[in-house]
Amino acid sequence: MTWICLSCMLWPEDLEAPKTHHFKVKTFKKVKPCGICRQVITREGCTCKVCSFSCHRKCQAKVAAPCIPPSSHELVPVNTETAPKNVVDTGEAASRGGNTRKSLEEDSSTRVTPSVQPHPQPIRNMSTSRTTEDSCELDLVYVTERIIAVSFPSTANEENFRSNLREVAQMLKSKHGGNYLLFNLSERRPDITKLHAKVLEFGWPDLHTPALEKICSVCKAMDTWLNADPHNVVVLHNKGNRGRIGVVIAAYMHYSNISASADQALDRFAMKRFYEDKIVPIGQPSQRRYVHYFSGLLSGSIKMNNKPLFLHHVIMHGIPNFESKGGCRPFLRIYQAMQPVYTSGIYNVQGDSQTSICITIEPGLLLKGDILLKCYHKKFRSPARDVIFRVQFHTCAIHDLGVVFGKEDLDDAFKDDRFPEYGKVEFVFSYGPEKIQGMEHLENGPSVSVDYNTSDPLIRWDSYDNFNGHRDDGMEEVVGHTQGPLDGSLYAKVKKKDSLHGSTGAVNATRPVLSATPNHVEHTLSVSSDSGNSTASTKTDKTDEPAPGPASAPAALSPEEKRELDRLLSGFGLEREKQGAMYHPQHLRSRPVGGPAAPSSGRHIVPAQVHVNGGALASERETDILDDELPNQDGHSVGSMGTLSSLDGVTNTSEGGYPEALSPLTNGLDKPYPMEPMVNGGGYPYESASRAVSAQAGHTAPMRPSYSTQEGLAGYQREGPHPAWPQSATTSHYGHDPNGMFRSQSFPETEPQLPPAPARGGSSREAVQRGLNSWQQQQQQQQQQQQPRPPPRQQERVHLESLGLSRPSPQPLAEPPMSGLPEFPRAASQQEIEQSIEALNMLMLDLEPATAGAPLHKSQSVPGAWPGASPLSSQPFSGSSCQSHPLTQSRSGYIPSGHSLGTPEPAPRAPLESVPTGRPYSPYDYQPCPTGPNQSYHPKSPATSSSSSFLPTTQSSVGPQQPPASLPGLTTQPQLPPKEVTSDPSRTPEEEPLNLEGLVAHRVAAYNARLQGTGRRVSSWHPPLHRLRSSSLSGVQAREKQPAEPPAPLRKRAASDGQYENQSPEPTSPRSPGVRSPVQCVSPELALTIALNPGGRPKEPHLHSYKEAFEEMEGTSPTSPPPSGVRSPPGLAKTPLSALGLKPHNPADILLHPTGEEDERKVLTELSEEPRSYVESVVRTAVAGPRTQEPEPKSFSAPGAQAYGHETPLRIGTLGGSFVSPSPLSTSSPILSADSTSVGSFPSGESSDQGARTPTQPLLDSGFRSGSLGQPSPLAQRNYQSSSPLPTAGSSYSSPDYSLQQFSSPEGQARSQFSVAGVHTVPGSPQARHRTVGTNTPPSPGFGRRAVNPSLAAPSSPSLSHRQVMGPLGTGFHGNTGSSPQSSAATTPGSPSLGRHPGAHQVSNLHGNVVTAPGSPSLGRHPGAHQGTLASNLHSNAVASPGSPSLGRHLGGSGSVVPGSPSLDRHVPYGGYSTPEDRRPTLSRQSSASGYQAPSTPSFPVSPAYYPGLSSPATSPSPDSAAFRQGSPTPALPEKRRMSMGDRAGSLPNYATVNGKVSSSPVASGMSSPSGGSTVSFSHTLPDFSKYSMPDNSPETRAKVKFVQDTSKYWYKPEISREQAIALLKDQEPGAFIIRDSHSFRGAYGLAMKVSSPPPTIMQQNKKGDMTHELVRHFLIETGPRGVKLKGCPNEPNFGSLSALVYQHSIIPLALPCKLVIPNRDPTDESKDSSGPANSTSDLLKQGAACNVLFVNSVDMESLTGPQAISKAISETLAADPTPAATIVHFKVSAQGITLTDNQRKLFFRRHYPLNTVTFCDLDPQERKWTKTEGGAPAKLFGFVARKQGSATDNACHLFAELDPNQPASAIVSFVSKVMLSAGQKR
């Protein structure tokens, strides 16, 4: 037994010889606890000059501890024998010194003398004598007084490790009580969460670096916790190489330096010494690189590069000697956000250190975010591979197209003698996928051979999937406790077991290298792909072999869950078993029992049996490119680009080894950990370990594929709440809204998990939010799904119990804190990656540590979370509501997912009530809440007052007002039963006060509070809108609601709007006394700065291809910066961070009003907007997350809707006012409101004044993201939101008159009635809300693109409205908002369904059908569209019965409209032009689940008449006709018509006026592929709505808007292809242009313009041939946080919308060759006039043709070609065992050749066969048929023969089977043979 001094933590050498202390009186500047009474020494106290022991002067006499000079201890030999630690640090033997023994001292050899440092501060005796690498002991070091590093060597054996863990836990509890928060930086372990009350999971693979945004999240979380309470300490736990701790310490050192204060200088110095002394020698180059990135981004020395980079070549200068005879057999694996995106062939290189080898990637591989490139050596004739080198970097810090890493910069290689001393690796990038000219010299010589057989499991095996596999830690032993601090004695007795020193756990040693289960995580859908869709391609790598289940019987998935999983996964090509893993966080988190993964450098032997992708990988080289359109990346992401990017490093077994086969067994843990998506895919369960479902809670952990790491935070309270946390009873529902939390969670989130702390995951922001929500949601859902839904509180309890934790009886406000802090899920989708990058920027922005004044402010921790404070909920979540439950309040309506849609959720009533109106003091709550409860959200409050009057009834009063029944639009639902009202208390999961005790959670909570508060304030009634942040936010789509789970109103950010629409307004909760003003996290200055720098989010949601994807997925628009309560560190706002893309906030989003209503407004805005900071997002998410679960019906309660009336006065223009003439508006104009007329879309002269708005003025835009169509201004939102928290939701028409009336704002500013885009509830449908665009200017084309939400409005449930479940459609699964996967959105007659994309989300539902009963106008933003959105491949049919106008933004989609029902395009009702996007029948960007929407190329002509000589008039080759002919999505731009009834001055202008397209027919062909090949025909005219009688105040009637002529319909052609654009422009005058949606970069736009002469380089290259095509130049318009800009043109500003960009360039060319000439007529009309019938092959070829087919196989033919090759290939394929699995691919034929795109990335991303390589194409000569696995008639087989890349003689035959009956194989073959090949021959 050993004694340890609790005060100084030193181990006395001789307890028997006490020495007298030498006390001196000292005034303590820093808070320090008394060593005797443990109370804080506030002013004067005594401190010993020798040992630094401190106490109160009055306690001095009680001191009994001997004075032990530190020096004596430094000399004390470490008693290694007593140290049970045999833990071997992976590669680094981190442990040192005896157990908890202050090995600190050892480490702190530099220990500061007492004179300098009164406290035992980091006794850093970095004694070099003890090499950390060899130490096998626990190493506990006080890096600073409040930061403790606990490290164990990876080799420590489990028994010793567990023993040490217990001892450390005892020591921490005895010394710090409950004031420590443990950050687990290594894989998750159940025992850690059992031993420690508060744990945040930020783990990542050992020896790797975390995602940049994860670093931000950790710093933010640490700062929040440390600032929350002077007693709080942070414990960094790591098992493995201490480099992980070093990264965090160094990053926090830089982070804290931003707002540095003199009193912290010593701490920073201590951190610096610790890092330099202990970490640098053992760290990895990439870890140092990331610390440098982080430091540079914070300081501004590194500018954020948001451009996507395409990697073309990886050149190794110097050949490593891995073979006995020299040379090596390298192959590359490239991971984006820890998701594999590319695997090269295996190069066989013989050479020496002077030789170079180039690995070429064609086409270029798109990389964005956190990138990991590993080069392996495949051993010759051995199933093993060695790591040659590994390098991690982040594209945001790459500014050169050539990057060189020397040996010292390469992980693994830097200390490997086999790698040449002067060797280096060079990366060659470009800004496009096209081959780089002039790089031919990089070709390898003939001696280098390449084997493209990447299907070998060894090659495919990824080593990051089991990083967090569930492990059984066997913590059955009781912690050998003590007597000690617990019994008041000064010393704690720690029982120590003798352990064999140095015995390393056999774990690693024995761990079979060959785990039966290869890690597949990498292959899981890569959540991180840009597209936000997980890339199945990444999956390709994964093996199907299931991993053994965990020992604990995993709970089996319920049939419903299985179905849901299957449905969701079906698009990914993943089997459920793989998914299974995802479900279980335990698995994910637990590591193989075997122990830590072996160092990645280890050799991996891959089981041969693993088959990739079901085998049948084409031998041909695959390019696994994560395209922006990766299809469903749900698997998690996120971390947006980095989300996944951050993938929280899941290295499960380090690369070195496979996860132990045991891993599954490992966890017996009863408490499932929140599922963290694996680092890689995070969520996708790989067969291996993940797969097991946690038996424990009996719930399956919901799969959160995209869960970003940070999301995990949400899982923070993984364990039961601990008493400390104040939590309202309702907490139980922690954000179960799957949507809210999980991206694509279609699975029930059965596993209870604590809300993760704000760890920022894929998209940190999102992740955080998700995290918070996720835990809540998961818990709730799990409970709900698994059990009858008990009341929320009860559910919560149940959850906890299921976890094995019993929760103290609910206390309304103070729940015990959950033991777990938020943890974040692991994977991120591409989107997430993007988001994460964006988030990263935001994060960095947000990172600014809070200034001393408001320690919490910085992150604005969750208000109420602190025990003393009212629960989070009580604080306004975003400060918005003062009410006791900020979280709950806001969306009180939230219904646990379990409830059926219509069922009200039992809401625990009281928490809210229990809390006094004024919220209790909460550290986080900086802003006092308004005094009166009512104050909370009154439309009338001054800020809002302007609009308040608008409402007929001033329900605004906080009272439990009933929704004004009178409001026509609001048909309020019958008042919700009290419980619903009360539901308020039952916080939506998001609202649930997370039991995040202090900590980030608080911050999060605060944000949530702010968000929620506002929402709440709006009306607690409203069911929490699900803040779907785009449901598929980072790649994760909000998980679709399970059938069982009621769709909750989503608060989604309109896909295009970039803001969340409340899917349904939440009824105001009577209780929500008033929402208090939101806590302001951001100082007004910062807010202003942010406002001025909307860089945070693309103003036009679609604009940013990558970011957009994330954002779309997130569905969040930037929210206003945290309210002023917190000041950002000085200068931070000015730092480039904002430039970093730290999700700067759209100024418009930021409500600067500091006061009451204004605050509320802010809150509302914030709610609707995307959180600006990750914390905020977390908060928001927390707030919103739960909402998600609420049934949408709940949201119906119109009360909120009524609020609509209070539109915020719009500064911008009068509603009716004519459109402000567009003046070039630079994006910089902070206020461009998304929709605000001139603001966002077009520059407007008035817009400038917006910029000037005073903080008090609500930014009109705040409600809108620039470009966001529907968001009402915050005021408006707030007003109407009073009824609904989300701005949009609230906008339901509350007043009879839809037009926003102008109210003079209290400020006295008269706001012109700007039509605020708001969600209007159509009269009669309480819930449905239509988001109208208030701006006069056409929104940027992108607006409509975002997610579609299904709107299910049961007759009774007004609120259904559409939940925009799916984030961007592309993202992967489209979540169903409907309760059923296929939820069809049906609105009963009379209840208009105003879904933004009702249909869309329908699409998102798989095959959702939207049916509108006759008479019920469906105002879906894209009702049909998403329906029509072929994109989703799902075939959703939207049928509007006659009589029911369907106002879908893209009604036409694929859905068919019954003849009688007018289909109003997006906002048809409002008259005006539809935005270009609106006009697009299908959401171009929404592309289907596959995530990739191919260019809208015409289908293959079936009739011979199409071919030369027989051209049919109908099919004129003109690009225009071609597009339309095929029914391709090319938008038919109807003439703009004004509704006859639309001439009302008050009407809200809607861009979309009557541009609506009616889809006259459903997709004709089965090609509903995202590629857009589907044939959808749209009528070009809109029905005259005037014929349909609609209430006078209906949106249609109000639709009169006068715009300056909108020419966008002439120049914005979203669906045309590049070739069509060229054809349209080649005969035009210079300056003519067309903007289309980029088909290569999702979310970006292509500008094609005619110039007078081609560039000189082109002239030289093409001296012969037709130069007319070269006169049409192409530019990429990329979207970013600040809007849109020309890519690659540094002197180009950012513009708030495409319109702004176009008008500016029509005035001055800037970087363009000449000015743009704005057309006054449609070029397609001209081309039709000028072009005769196409009868030449060249015309047809220019047009191209495409459709979807089944790719069967590719067979090597050597030199064989012709029909014999086709026949032979088919024979071999059919005879193969097993028969290859067919994959749907997009088959496009053009003048360039044949391009195959695997929309789901199952086999490859895209393959192109140039025209000159294709030699033959024909049907099977033997007429054999292909039997489809899914059934159906046998399909004809056909194929083409093409020369293999790089060979002049060898051919390969590529076989296909017809898929679409309307596109028979014969038509395809005819086109290829008669058109393409014949054209090639003529040349």
Swiss-Prot record:
Presence of keyword RNA-binding: no
Main localization, broad class: other
PROSITE patterns xrefs: C2_TENSIN (PS51182), PPASE_TENSIN (PS51181), SH2 (PS50001), ZF_DAG_PE_1 (PS00479), ZF_DAG_PE_2 (PS50081)
One GO CC term, this protein: cell surface
The SH2 domain, residue ranges: 1611-1720
Compositionally biased residues, Polar residues: 110-130, 525-538, 1059-1071, 1234-1259, 1268-1315, 1376-1391, 1429-1439, 1483-1500
Enzyme Commission (EC) number: 3.1.3.-
Composition bias, Basic and acidic residues: 1097-1110, 1155-1173
Modification sites for Phosphoserine: 463, 489, 503, 558, 746, 829, 892, 897, 922, 1056, 1064, 1120, 1124, 1273, 1325, 1340, 1416, 1441, 1456, 1461, 1528, 1540, 1547, 1594, 1736
Residue ranges constituting the C2 tensin-type domain according to the UniProt record: 306-432
Extent of Low complexity compositional bias: 776-787, 870-884, 936-957, 1221-1233, 1350-1361, 1511-1523, 1558-1575
UniProt modification remark: Extensively phosphorylated on serine and threonine residues in a p38 MAPK-dependent manner which reduces interaction with DLC1 and increases interaction with tyrosine-phosphorylated proteins including BCAR1/p130cas and PTK2/FAK. The majority of the phosphorylated Ser/Thr residues are immediately adjacent to a proline residue. Also phosphorylated on tyrosine residues.
Zinc finger (Phorbol-ester/DAG-type): 20-67
List of glycosylated residues: S1315
Highest rank taxon of the organism: Eukaryota
Region Disordered, annotated ranges: 90-130, 523-562, 695-831, 854-999, 1013-1575
S-S bridge residues: none
GO function term, MF aspect, one: actin binding
GO biological process, one term: cell-substrate junction assembly
Cellular location(s): Cell surface; Cell junction, Focal adhesion; Cytoplasm, Cytoskeleton
Modification sites for Phosphothreonine: T988, T1337
Function (record text): May act as a protein phosphatase and/or a lipid phosphatase. Involved in fibrillar adhesion formation. Essential for myofibroblast differentiation and myofibroblast-mediated extracellular matrix deposition. Enhances RHOA activation in the presence of DLC1. Plays a role in cell polarization and migration. May be involved in cartilage development and in linking signal transduction pathways to the cytoskeleton.
Protein family membership: Belongs to the PTEN phosphatase protein family.
Assembly and binders: Binds to actin filaments and interacts with phosphotyrosine-containing proteins. Interacts with STARD8. Interacts with protein phosphatase PPP1CA. Interacts (via N-terminus) with Rho GTPase-activating protein DLC1; the interaction is decreased by phosphorylation of TNS1. Interacts with tyrosine-phosphorylated proteins BCAR1/p130Cas and PTK2/FAK; the interactions are increased by phosphorylation of TNS1.
Protein name, per record: Tensin-1
Organism: Bos taurus
Phylogenetic classification of the source organism: Eukaryota, Metazoa, Chordata, Craniata, Vertebrata
